[in-house]
Amino acid sequence: MAPNIRKSHPLLKIINNSLIDLPSPSNISAWWNFGSLLGICLITQILTGLLLAMHYTADTTLAFSSVAHTCRNVQYGWFIRNLHANGASFFFICIYLHIGRGLYYGSYLYKETWNTGVILLLTLMATAFVGYVLPWGQMSFWGATVITNLFSAIPYIGQTLVEWAWGGFSVDNPTLTRFFALHFLLPFVIAGITLVHLTFLHESGSNNPLGIISHCDKIPFHPYFSLKDILGFTLMFIPLLSLAFFSPNLLGDPENFTPANPLATPPHIKPEWYFLFAYAILRSIPNKLGGVLALAASVLILFLIPLLHKSKQRSMTFRPLSQLLFWFLVANLLILTWIGSQPVEHPFIIIGQVASFTYFLILLVLFPAIAALENKMIY
């Protein structure tokens, strides 16, 4: 009998073992769909981004009008741009849900997979930030100015670092040029780290909702989960296309319809919605360096999660107290997101400070404490 090329060819064999004959737990729920959704988001963003880059000019005098030209004169340019801008939002929705799933079901105990995932999140955040600057609208310019300026809080080397990043003494043409170069490069870096992420995942196999070893009950990825993933793609593309067609500017900032003007500051400088929780944490500390450290800690804290796992069970499925705390954390993040979009005035300042404190308290203190308490109650 002739050997099956799918199983013998050096390249196809890798694809087969990753996407076709991969043994998967039989009970993984829809929460396990977000990995593949992130993959399809990345592919969509790279394709639409490539098409946009063909019509974009990375120059301060031309950037804004080149984006306008793409939307007005390029065939389906408006659609490609809307898909790219809103695709970024869906990318972040998927990654936040994916991380939430990992937290809830204890997937972070696959430490290498988790750590590469956090690196992917950081790279994605960097990519989205530099991408937001490219249309060179008011919020693009001032967002870039405010966020890059944070590096000046680093003692001794801060100011030099900022001027080095800017390529001058303010955000200007060199900044835009290098941000475009970085925005072009980073998605391919993300694709590379994704392969590492998957390699580590396939070393151990997927976790499952019960958080128990599932070697005795595995099913092939294809057709079961390949079909389930296609359903997931459909369910994601429906709202994405609806947003891109019917309300493309819903999540954007109206300030970005005005070309960048270094002489006029917008009344409220705020990032895109997916960074608002971190922005709220940054603003809640009335000290520049303290705020920057809190901002960094708000994301880097994810690296500590595996070390703070004190429960004798992996998943939260059978831990009602931890579940309650988890949903408190979700509510807390929603409050932070709302606060980040509000002006810096009473009562938003104090709400933001309480929510920021609670965020770190839940992750660093309450999760391990409640886990230890549950161990006492159960065992």
UniProtKB/Swiss-Prot annotation:
Q: Which cysteines are joined by disulfide bonds?
A: none
Q: Could you give a single Gene Ontology term from the biological process aspect?
A: mitochondrial electron transport, ubiquinol to cytochrome c
> Membrane-crossing residues?
34-54, 78-99, 114-134, 179-199, 227-247, 289-309, 321-341, 348-368
Q: Which CDD domains match?
A: cytochrome_b_C, Cytochrome_b_N
Highest taxon in the source lineage: Eukaryota
The molecular function terms in GO held by this entry are:
metal ion binding; ubiquinol-cytochrome-c reductase activity
- Membrane-protein topology: Multi-pass membrane protein
Q: Name a GO CC annotation attached to this entry.
A: mitochondrial inner membrane
List of residues binding heme b b566: 98, 197
Which keywords accompany this UniProt record?
Electron transport, Heme, Iron, Membrane, Metal-binding, Mitochondrion, Mitochondrion inner membrane, Respiratory chain, Transmembrane, Transmembrane helix, Transport, Ubiquinone
- The parts of the chain that form a coiled coil are none
**Cofactor note from UniProt?**
Binds 2 heme b groups non-covalently.
| InterPro entries listed in its UniProt record | Cyt_b/b6_C (IPR005798), Cyt_b/b6_C_sf (IPR036150), Cyt_b/b6_N (IPR005797), Cytb/b6-like_sf (IPR027387), Cytochrome_b (IPR030689), Cytochrome_b_C_euk/bac (IPR048260), Cytochrome_b_N_euk/bac (IPR048259), Di-haem_cyt_TM (IPR016174)
Q: Where in the cell is it found?
A: Mitochondrion inner membrane
Which cofactor(s) are needed, names only? heme b
Q: Which residues bind heme b b562?
A: 84, 183
| Pfam families named in the record | Cytochrom_B_C (PF00032), Cytochrome_B (PF00033)
Q: How does it assemble?
A: The cytochrome bc1 complex contains 11 subunits: 3 respiratory subunits (MT-CYB, CYC1 and UQCRFS1), 2 core proteins (UQCRC1 and UQCRC2) and 6 low-molecular weight proteins (UQCRH/QCR6, UQCRB/QCR7, UQCRQ/QCR8, UQCR10/QCR9, UQCR11/QCR10 and a cleavage product of UQCRFS1). This cytochrome bc1 complex then forms a dimer.
What task does this protein carry out? Answer: Component of the ubiquinol-cytochrome c reductase complex (complex III or cytochrome b-c1 complex) that is part of the mitochondrial respiratory chain. The b-c1 complex mediates electron transfer from ubiquinol to cytochrome c. Contributes to the generation of a proton gradient across the mitochondrial membrane that is then used for ATP synthesis.
Q: Please give the name of this protein.
A: Cytochrome b
**Organism listed in the record:** Struthio camelus
Gene for this chain: MT-CYB
